[in-house]
Amino acid sequence: MWQAEVRVDLDAIRENVSWLRSGSAAELMAVVKGDGYGHGMVPAAHAALDGGADWLGVCTLDEALTLRRAGITVPVLAWLLAPGLPLHEGVTAGIDLGVASVAQLEEMVEAGRVAGRPARLHLKIDTGLSRGGATISEWPELLDAAAKAQADGAVEVVGVWSHFVYADAPGHPTTDRQLAVFHEGLGMVEKAGLRPRYRHLANSAATLTRPDAHFDLVRPGLAVYGLSPVAGERFGLRPAMTARARVMLTKQVPAGAGVSYGHTYTTDRASNLAVIPLGYADGVPRDASNSGPVQLGGVRRTISGRVCMDQFVLDCGDDPVAPGDVATLFGTGRDGEPTADDWAEAVGTINYEIVTRFGSTRVPRCYDGERP
């Protein structure tokens, strides 16, 4: 018997990746950073590969090394790399590394020297996000340094890449501007004498809506897990995560009873209350107080009062409810339960954050569709 659980449907991940892969001639990198967006990095990676993914993408060196320790041998790109990391371990493990500056390139050269083999690099150009990557004015210097390092046998420039700002808002002019900057940057790559095998720019949203941005490799993340990056569009994706818990306690209270800390909710009639053993330590946003949707007894209800560290309360009115009944916070929506999108709307965030929060806590994660 379980008290609370996050269930992950690995067949949904396989199906989503297969569908995404069929929509483009480009290779596909399934992004499994953030513990697979809360779905479990290694199980999600295996499922994505089953579905036809060619690459895996992560942020950190530790994430990439974990994939290698799990026996995964496909190309892996790691791109969020602070100074001073043991990058030679990544080079030895055959991990591709993202490079955003000349200083970072110098670290990669040293890592290759220590590892005794060239570091495989993807040079990143900042096309407008103002985050990682070399700006268009810095780009020639990075390209010249990379070309020299490659000529010296210290590195191999495998890819050139960037990241969109507004791809989740189809038609936004910034996307076209970024694409133009990327093309400008690619022209400079050629002039520097580099011939990288992979050019990549498309995240989930661009994979789904901008075939002109697919180039040689697409990098879907959220869509792998069945969630849409574009508001109001489902694209036929199948959500992979369900979060639920069993009612811990029920009680009858009179009209006018204050509920949870601060009594921010008061019953307007005699009511049956259900205490659910999930709280902000389990990924339930405290901002879901008096707003988070939950299905219990086939009825959508709203969290009553403040979310606590370990529990919250539902006002069930006259409806019968008993300890052990299942409360579903979100799932696919097929049976009328809330979705991660519903939760994101209720608390003023994005579906990415909802699944990542719920899937990366003390709540046990269980899997359907596991393969031997």
Curated annotation (Swiss-Prot):
Origin superkingdom: Bacteria
Concerning CDD domains, the annotation shows: PLPDE_III_AR
Which Enzyme Commission number(s) are on file for it?
A: 5.1.1.1
Q: Where is the active site?
A: K33 (proton acceptor), Y261 (proton acceptor)
Cofactor(s) for this UniProt protein: pyridoxal 5'-phosphate
PANTHER family, alphabetically?
A: ALANINE RACEMASE, ALANINE RACEMASE, CATABOLIC-RELATED
Q: Which HAMAP family match?
A: Ala_racemase (MF_01201)
This protein's name: Alanine racemase
